[in-house]
């Protein structure tokens, strides 16, 4: 699995949410992470929300896309990442 993002969006995300995409990708290594299809809006693409724990033990919520490259590599394209709320932290603890 590979990760990608727009660097300008990453800088904006750090400024707005205090979370770098480089750190947020760690949630996908969490064996208890949870990914759900984001059906809140009528996006023109299939968007996902993943919640998980980073190596620094921080609950992070990531908005992202999944897609396959022509060579078959699976790509996760980061859209946004933020620290989880208290409610999201409790939800995560109940699934882990």
Which residues does each PLM region occupy?
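Ribonuclease/tRNase effector modules and their secretory precursors
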Residues: 1-96
